[in-house]
A protein has these predicted regions:
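Conserved beta-strand signature within the Rossmann-like core of class I S-adenosyl-L-methionine
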Residues: 118-125
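A generic alpha-to-beta junction signature in SAM-dependent methyltransferases
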Residues: 9, 13, 57, 114-117
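A short glycine-rich, Lys/Arg-flanked "PGG" loop and its adjoining helix->strand segment in the class I
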Residues: 99-117
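Class I SAM-dependent methyltransferase SAM/SAH-binding core
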Residues: 17-71
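Class I S-adenosyl-L-methionine
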Residues: 127-192
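A short acidic, Gly/Pro-enriched loop at the edge of an enzyme's catalytic core
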Residues: 68-81
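Conserved alpha-helix/loop element of class I SAM-dependent methyltransferases that forms part
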Residues: 1-17, 32
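A short beta-strand submotif of the Rossmann-like class I SAM-dependent methyltransferase core
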Residues: 83-86
Length: 204
């Protein structure tokens, strides 16, 4: 599943990057990132799972964190983020004091801040129902991301969903770059046309 997330992220070959592994658990997905040569930091709410990861001697740094309360990383720390089989827990209010919408907002607002410009995310999870997908997608779109949903094996009882997101400012930067390229090409064409008109004048 981590391989599928990496595939969706489409990381350029040879690119040095730092990846945030959300809900890293025992470090299985982190080990896949290591095999691909990526540096990573893993966060998980379960101290016991992080102990297992340490026993497995994973190469990433590990942090005990409830992502529903948000991240506290420095702005622009990560180039990519993945999550394998964890995001659905944000949609479950295990304690009466938990507010699902607030926890999702904390998650996406703080994630947006700690991602670099142009960052991409791929989150694989098992939704209990369509409402969970809608909740997660709605919160992401309201807090600076754009993206979509990929459903692998939709007719299987074990179907899984992968949501991919882009920082919205990366889309803005892309549109800005395309607009600047358009203006540059337009200017070049105008200069070329002007030159042709002058040549025609001289010939006449």
């Amino acid at each position: 599943m981590a391989e599928r997330c990496i595939e969706i992220l489409a990381i350029p070959e040879g690119k040095e990057c730092l990846i945030l592994d959300i809900g890293c658990g025992s470090g299985l997905s982190g080990s896949v990132l290591t095999d691909h040569g990526y540096e990573w930091i893993g966060v998980d709410i379960s101290p016991s799972m992080l102990e297992v990861a340490k026993e497995n001697e994973v190469e990433g740094d590990l942090i005990n964190l409830d992502v529903g309360q948000g991240f506290s990383f420095r702005a622009g720390s990560f180039d990519y983020a993945i999550s394998v089989s964890a995001l659905q827990w944000l949609c479950i209010a295990e304690k009466s004091k938990y507010n699902v919408n607030k926890r999702l907002k904390n998650f996406f607002v703080s994630l947006y801040k700690c991602l670099n410009i142009g960052a991409r995310c791929a989150f694989q999870f098992y939704p209990a129902n369509p409402e969970q997908i809608n909740l997660i997608t709605k919160s992401a779109l309201e807090n600076g991301f754009t993206g979509g949903v990929v459903v692998d094996f939709p007719h299987s009882t074990k179907k899984k969903s992968i949501i991919y997101f882009y920082k919205l400012d990366s889309l803005k930067n892309l549109l800005k770059m395309l607009w600047m390229l358009f203006l540059k090409m337009r200017l070049m064409m105008m200069k070329k046309m002007k030159k042709l008109m002058l040549l025609e004048k001289e010939e006449n």
